[in-house]
Amino acid sequence: MIAAKRIYDPPSSSEGMRVLIMRLWPRGIRKTRVDVWLKELGPVLPLLRAFRGGKLTWPQYTRRYLAGLERPEAQAPLAQVRAAAKDGTVTLFCGCPDETRCHRSLLRAYLLDSPASRRRKSGRAPRRRTARGGAR
């Protein structure tokens, strides 16, 4: 199971493995509050600054953040979260006050909608696309 929560909220025993997904360490948070810091899964700082500065809309930010999860340096941390989620609960943490406009909700949805998750839910492999973009 994969959950998402704000790092400044009080801890709970149901959080399982606590994964911080921010590029910068949050102020006032002790290192003992998280089990793993996977900063590669946080948005790159120029993207975050552009969104917070009003230069990007939420849909633009979403597209760019999700595209960033395809980067080679994000693959090992993504695999680490997926592996931990197979064994129990993983809670993704960041400091954003609004979860509906936060990368932690985007990452959670991305992980839950991964090809492996879709295969488990449907019981079959996803359809492959042809060179023209149609399904086989």
What are the functions of these language-model segments?
Residues 1-136:
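Residues lining hydrophobic/aromatic ligand-binding pockets adjacent to catalytic sites
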